[in-house]
């Protein structure tokens, strides 16, 4: 018997990828799988984005809690079959005992951190790096309507200008050498623009534009359509990389740091990733970028495997089929542990090489 009524812990509802993923899973749990989704959220938190709360309210029953410990009682009172939570992945007190807990881990974790009734990672890369594919994974989904409008006129950006852009968590564009290279590049080329959404400002220039965060999907698509390419500069990299997927599915190339420790986005993009190791390579990419040639290429690496239907099929198989992927059934061999150690060593060597390119 599968779980049918699922409680999703939204915690703090923000503009970050975790809240986007939480919404997508809950929505398609209803629309594709035909189940019921109930959203729990932390009423005490001051970090909620009102636009994100409104987005959730349009589709789900929202139930507030004062303290995480209240969820045992609330889950029982609402006859929840299972409790889903997406979090960093280590053992903590964010688990409830009254119903099965479905743990979705966002970051690399040691094997000793496995807990809950079902435990899965958010990407194939995490499953490989941390368990040699023995811990299951359920990826995020990328789903965007096909709209043609952009923000160039609104932002006074000429049609012929080269535009590079990024959105994400406010602190996610954090490679200092990239920030400096952007400022150097706009000084070298009067036809180059950079636009950022929900990113903390790091420069003052009329062609480096910072926009506030926006949860509206139409606006997000207009933002992507404004860009000729994504410039990605999150030092740690991506354990999944929703924003990279959203640019890619809109047929925009992703320019990303080659030496990041977390590399799911690089694995998925494969040969279509435009990678840089240091400021010289990045400046060359900016200055030599051919927007017309780029627009004629196929950059989409996400439509086939990461659309809602295949993702929710995997979500159902891993999380909802009542024990078919139970955490206590995960068996890790000595060979698996050795493989995970090898991946960690490779990560350290990559990190040590960073200074060679600065």
PLM regions with names:
Residues 140-204, 210-213, 217:
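Conserved catalytic-core segment of nucleotide-activated headgroup transferases in glycan assembly
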Residues 116-148:
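Donor nucleotide-sugar binding/catalytic pocket of nucleotide-sugar-dependent glycosyltransferases
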């Amino acid at each position: 018997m599968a779980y049918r009524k699922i409680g999703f812990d939204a915690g703090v509802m923000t503009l970050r990828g975790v809240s986007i993923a939480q919404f997508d899973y809950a929505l398609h749990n209803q629309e594709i799988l035909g189940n019921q989704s109930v959203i729990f959220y932390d009423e005490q938190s001051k970090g909620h984005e009102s636009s994100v709360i409104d987005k959730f309210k349009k589709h789900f029953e929202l139930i507030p809690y004062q303290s995480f410990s209240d969820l045992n009682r609330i889950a029982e009172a609402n006859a929840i079959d299972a409790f889903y939570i997406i979090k960093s992945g280590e053992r903590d007190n964010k688990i409830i005992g009254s119903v099965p807990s479905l743990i979705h881990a966002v970051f690399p974790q040691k094997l000793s951190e496995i807990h809950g009734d079902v435990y899965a990672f958010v990407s194939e890369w995490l499953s490989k790096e941390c368990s040699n594919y023995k811990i299951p994974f359920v990826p995020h989904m990328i789903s965007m309507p096909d709209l043609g409008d952009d923000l160039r006129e609104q932002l006074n950006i000429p049609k012929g200008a080269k535009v590079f852009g990024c959105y994400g968590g406010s602190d996610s564009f954090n490679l200092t050498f990239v920030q400096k290279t952007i400022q150097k590049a706009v000084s070298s080329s009067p036809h180059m623009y950079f636009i950022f959404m929900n990113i903390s400002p790091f420069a003052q220039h009329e062609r480096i534009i910072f926009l506030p965060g926006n949860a509206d999907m139409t606006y997000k698509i207009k933002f992507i359509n404004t860009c000729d390419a994504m410039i990605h500069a999150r030092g740690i990299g991506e354990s999944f990389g929703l924003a990279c997927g959203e640019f890619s599915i809109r047929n925009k190339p992703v320019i990303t740091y080659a030496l990041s420790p977390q590399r799911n986005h690089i694995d998925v993009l494969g040969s279509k990733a435009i990678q840089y190791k240091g400021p010289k390579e990045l400046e060359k990419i900016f200055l030599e970028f051919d927007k017309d040639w780029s627009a004629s290429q196929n950059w989409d690496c996400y439509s086939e495997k990461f659309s809602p239907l295949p993702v929710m099929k995997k979500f159902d198989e891993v999380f909802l089929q009542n024990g078919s992927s139970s955490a206590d059934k995960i068996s890790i061999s000595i060979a698996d542990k050795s493989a995970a150690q090898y991946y960690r060593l490779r990560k350290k060597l990559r990190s040590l090489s960073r200074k060679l390119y600065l």
